[in-house]
Amino acid sequence: MSDGFGKIGFSGTLRPSQVASSSIIRKELESGSRELLIVAPPGSGKTVLGLYVWSDLVRLPTLVLSPNSAIQAQWVERAKELFHLDDRESEIGTDPENPGILTSLTYQSVTLPKRGGGELDESAMELWISSLMTPDLNDGSVEADDRESALAWIADLREKNFEYYSDRMGHYRKKVRDSLSEHGNALWILHESAKANLKRLLEVGVGLVILDECHHLMDHWGRVLIEAMEFLGNPVVLGLTATPPEGASNSSVDQYFDLFGEVDYEVPVPALVRDGNLAPYQDLAYFVRPSPGELRYIANVDEDFKSLLGELKGGAENVKGRTPKLEVWIARVLDGLILPAGRAKDWNSFHRRDPRLADAARAYLASGELNLPEGVPQPSAELVAGGNSMDVLITILDRYIRNGLMRSESEEDHALAEDAKSKLRMLGVQITGGGPRLCASPVGRVMAYASAKYDALRDILRAEMETLGPDIRAVIVTDFEKTSATALVEGVLDDDAGGAVAAYRAVLGCESTDRLDPVLMTGTTVLVDDDLLERIFPRFEQWVSERNLNIKFDYIERGGYFEIRGKGKDWLPRHYTMMITEMFQDGVTKCLVGTRGLLGEGWDASRINVLVDLTTVTTSMSINQLRGRSFRLDKHWPEKVANNWDIVCLADEFTKGFDDYLRFKRKHKQLYGVCDDGAIEKGVGHVHAAFTEAEPEGVSETMEIFNEEMLMRARNRGRARELWGIGQPFNAVPREAIEIKGSFGEGFPPANRIGLVAWSDESLIQAIGDAVACSLQALGLIRFDAKVGGGSRGGGWMRAYLEDASEEESEIFAEAMQEILGPLDNPRYVIPREVKVVSETWLSEMLPKVIAKYFRRSENILSMYHVVPSKLCRNLEDAKVFEQQWNWKVSPGEVMYGHSKKGKEWVSEIKMAGLAPKSSFHRKSVFT
C-alpha cells in the first residue's frame, strides 16, 4: 500500500493457520474492508500474524494496543527478532511520546479517564442527588425528599465518613464517564495524557491499529476506542483474540462488533495441534474429600438447611395474621392461582406469568404424594422425579419467603424470613426483591480451597517428577497471592488457604517436591526456595546487569524460603517476570507458583509441561488464556505433551457437595480435549467418560481408582500424543456419538472358525455398530463411505460414532445404537444374540495349548435379545436386510415381530428372564 517501508518484511515462514488467516485478511483489505477480527488460541502465532499484516500487507505506521505491559513488550521483541527492519529499529518502540512506524502501547495509555475535574465532579454530584431522590424499586422508600435535603445528606456524610464519601463519589464519576462514552462523548472524559498520546499518533499518520486480546474491549476501553478510531482518521482495525464475546450484554456485544465486524477467521485448538503448531496436551483431574474439620462445617450448614425446611414445613397453622406452613401455602397458591399482582384468570395464565413456580409447586407436592388442587394439571414424571432437587426447592422457598413470609402482618414471619435468607446465603443463594440470585457460598469456598488439595498437589508433582525427571517444568496457578478466610469460614480454613503462598508452602513442605526448587512470583512478591538462593541470586544480578536496569537486590529469610526485595525504578513486575521466566526456561527453577493475573494472559513460557490449575475462575476467556500457557511448542522437546491438572473436592452426601465439580465442569465447557478412543470432544466429558453434564458418575465410591487412572495417563504421554493424530486433518463439523456402559462382552463370536478371540465389550459394540451402519447404507439412509469409529473410554464406557458422515447421518446412527443396546421398550422387532461357549475336554487338557484348541468342546448359547432400530424395521423387508447384516457380523438369529399379542407376551418373558440389555448412555458431540 505504501513504498515508505522499503525492505521491511517478514523474514520467516508462516504456519498453515497464519497463511489461511493472512489470505483472508488480504482479500478483505483488497475489497475495502477496514474492520478485521481473527480468533485463534494462545500460542497460535497471533503476534507474528499481526506483525505480518503490518510489514507485508498494510505497510503503514501502526499502533498496537495490549492489555498489559508484558504483552506490550512482546510485540517489539518479536518484530526485532523475526522481521527484517531495514535499519529502522529506532522507529519501533513502546514510548507513547515518541511514536514511529510501529508503536506498541497499553490500552490504558490512550483510554485513561479523568480522575476528577470540575465538570465531571459536577455531573457526578447531580447523579448522586438524583439517586437519593429516586424511590427504591423494592419498597418505594427515598433517602431525600428534595434537592436541599439530598445536599445536606451528602455534606453530612462527607464530614463524618470521608472515605465512604470518596468511594461513592468515585462510583458516580464512573457512571457519568460510562454514560458519556456510551452517548458519543468518550474523548471528552479522557485524561490529558491520553489525549496527548492520541494527538501524537494522529501526527505520525497511523494507518493500522492492532487490538491484541481484544476481548477486553466490551466496556470503557471499547467505547473510547470507537471514537478514537474516528479521531485517527479511521485506520484499518485488526482485532486478535482467543475468546470472542460470550454471555455479555447486547449493548456490549454491539459495541464490540462496531469495532471489528463479524469474525473473519477462527482457528480451533485441535486443528493447530494436528498441524504440529501447538503441543498436544491432556486434561486430567484428581479428586479429594474435605478434611474432617471441613466436613463438620459442611455438615452443620447442611443440617441448618434441613432444620430450616423442617421449620417452614411445620410452621404456623390457622394462626390469624401468620403465613401458613410451606405445603399449605403452596396448595393455596395453586388452588387460588394467587400471584403478587393478583389472581390469574386460569391455569394457563398462571403458568405463563410464573412458569417456574407453576412447575416447581406441582413437582414438590406430587413428589411428596400430596394431592394437587382441582383444575391443576398433573406434572410429568420427569418433573416429579426432580421434586426435591435444589432447583425446585430454591424456587419454592424464594416465593414462600418473598410472597408469603415477607408480606405477612406478623413480625415473627418477618424474622423467620430473615433467618431463612441468611441460611440460604450459606448455600450460595441470595433472595432479592427480584428473585433468587447465586452468590458466593461459604461452603463453596471451603470446597474450592480444601486442605486436601495440597496433598493432591504433591501427589501430582511426585508422579510428574518420576516421569519427566529433570525436564519437568511445572506451573501452579492460583487466584490470588493470599486468600484471607472470611468470618463465616474462620477456624475452618487456614488464613491463606487457596492463595499462591499456601500452594508454595505445600510444595516446599515435602522433601521430594522441594527438589523442584520452586519460585513464587506475583504482582507484588517474589519468593525463592532456600536451597536455590545461592544459585539463582547471582543469575538475577547478571540478568539485570546485561540489560542495564536500575535494580538493587536484597533478600529476607522467611523460614524455609527467602523473599526477594528490589529497589530502583526498574523493579517492576514486567522485568522480574521476564527474568524469572528465563530462569524457569533454563531449568534453574523447575516449578513456578503464581497468580492468574501474572501467569495468565500474555505470559509466555514454552517449556511448561505440567500445569496445575487451583483457580476458581470459570469464564471461557480466563480459562482459554490460562490453559493456553501449556500448549506452546518446546524446541528442546519436540515430542512435548503437556498435562493440565484440575483438583476437585467432592462431598456428594451434602447439599452443596458437588459445588467444586460444577465449577470444574464450567471450566471445561468450551475446552477441547482428546479422548481415550481418539475422538476430540468439547466439554468435561473429554477428561473421562464418567464426567457428565449432571454429575460425576461413580467417582465418590471409587475415588482412589479414578486418581490412579489419571496418574497412569499422566505417565503415558506417548499414548496421549498418539491419540491426537498429529498430521491428520481436523474436521470441525461435530458428530453425534453414543457412549454405552453395560455388560455385553462374554463368550466367543458364534462362527465356525478356530482360534477366535473372545468378545470384549469393545469388539462386540464395534461389530454391532458395523451391522447397524451396513444396514443403514443398504437402505440408503447413510452414505456408503461412512464407517464406524470409537472404542473404549475407560471405566467400562464404550463409544461409537460415524466417521465421514453428515451431522444428520451421525445422529441417525447414534439413535439406532442407543435403541439396539437399550431396553426392550415396546419394540417393533427384536433379534436374538448368541455367543459360543468353549469348554475343555479330557484330551484338550492333556495337549499343549497350541494343539489343544482344536479339541475343545464348543456350543452356541442364547445371550441376549436386542431391539431392531426403528429406522431399520419400518417393514419386514427392511428388518430382513438388518437380519442379514446381524448374521454376518454378530450372531445367527431371525427377527421376530413384537407388536402382536403373542409378541408382546414373548417380549415380557424375555425381560423376566433377564435377557434384555441393561445399559447406561451418554449422548455426545465429538470431532474427528
Question: What annotation goes with each model-predicted range?
Answer:
Residues 41-44, 96-103, 115, 130-186, ...:
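Conserved C-terminal RecA-like helicase domain
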Residues 5, 38, 425-426, 434, ...:
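Non-catalytic terminal extensions of ATP-dependent helicases
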Residues 47, 52-83, 106-112, 221, ...:
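Conserved Walker A/P-loop ATP-binding site and its immediately adjacent core
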Residues 272-279, 605, 618-624, 631-712:
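A conserved SF2-helicase RecA2
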Residues 31-53, 217:
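Walker A/P-loop
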